[in-house]
Amino acid sequence: AEVDRVLTATGSRWGQLDTIGEQEHRGIARRMYKAYPDLFAEGTVRAVSSYSPRSIMSMYSFTHELAQQSSAISVETASGRQFNTLVRNFDIDEEYKAYRNDTAYAGAYGRYLAQNLTVEPLLRLVGENYELDYETISDLALAEYYVAAGMNAMGLEFDASKYFTLEEYKRLWSIFNFRQYLLY
């Protein structure tokens, strides 16, 4: 039922910037303007984006709000692959690519996963009679958390306590965040 709600709410718009994302970027611009008004007293704001439509819309939401905050500035925007070296450094930075290809971090992640993974929420959802290997069950347990965490981020009302205890949620959150920290 929850997955159906996600599919209905997203309406095949995977990867597009939604109104929540637009609001977040406008909010960042407003806070930046209020924190550093002298920076925007006059002059030109130049913004660049990669070729990704979501990235372009993020840039436009941000710069549009800056222009709304101060009529004394002019705004110039540009997007395209020519800016990849600036905004997609993870694709071109050779040291980072070598780190991602070197699986040295996998040991630390594997140990942390083994110590903190909780599969009880998943087993409560699908039942205990499924014969799944450890890798599959850990992937599914994290996917269950990821869907749950994403519901609120998408503005969909979601009560995680129907699926997770607070301790289970914290443990899955910590695994997901540790992975993000190691990889990104």
Where are these regions (language model features)?
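Signature for phosphate-centric chemistry
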Residues: 1-44, 52-184
